[in-house]
Amino acid sequence: MIHGSLSDLTALLSLEALTDERFVAEPRSGSRWRVYGGQFLGQGLIAATHGADLPVRAFHGYFIRAGNATQPLFYQVERLSEDHRQVRVHQEDKLLFTMEVVLGEYGSAPGIPMPDVPGPDACIPREKGIQNLQTDTESTWAVVDSPFDNRFVENIWHDVPAPPQHHVWFRTRQSAAKHDISAMEGQHMRQAVLAYYADDTIMDNALFPHGWAGSWERLQTTSLDHAMWFHADVPVDTWLLHAQDSPTAGGGRGMTRGLIYRQSGELVATAAQEILMRVSTGR
């Protein structure tokens, strides 16, 4: 995930239009390692909604190959219908990611009530949990320097097997109004910011039964796909609760899902993801 402010994140998600259907994302200064999955999701939404008036109702993205964060990414959009877009991402002539995006107005309806959990002020800041886990000050700085403020209901920073679920309060550290994404014309960027964030912690639920803190050394993990459905506008600079779980994890695969609520209890988005999990051989 990106270091820096909300301005840095919106700059990352913004694309240069080569044509009305082809876009490029240039690498950021200091980029290294592979492309974070949420970057594909957020940039894919920005590409798909270019020139669109309607918000995104749903998308489903498939991760095909890892991307090199030091090289440009090229986004090609095909307009399948008035409200249906397909996005394909290439790097050096290799297909990395595909996404189907559906546009449409929100439709409110009764849903699963928000879990009864403590509010964000009573929860564990992410940087505190990381500091309790290890002494790598550079990693801790990276968490503090994130565009997002995260507050965890459960203490996940241990290597004891735990139930495959947790709850996280989150919001951007800076106001959306100060970054020109609070008005109606900023709705696509708000959705892209949420899609970018939603890929961050949802995978962890499949790892908790293995002892989350020790899983990263024992397991190799990667996202296979990610889907989201938007039920209402997304106020990314106010507290949102991401209630997550993993209904099944076995045979090298893990299924995870998340419900995202306003603090008032309104369900604003639903997410689902499948991941690949392999035991590391240490070679």
Place the predicted regions along the sequence by residue.
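Terminal targeting signals and extreme-terminal segments of soluble enzymes
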Residues: M1-R283
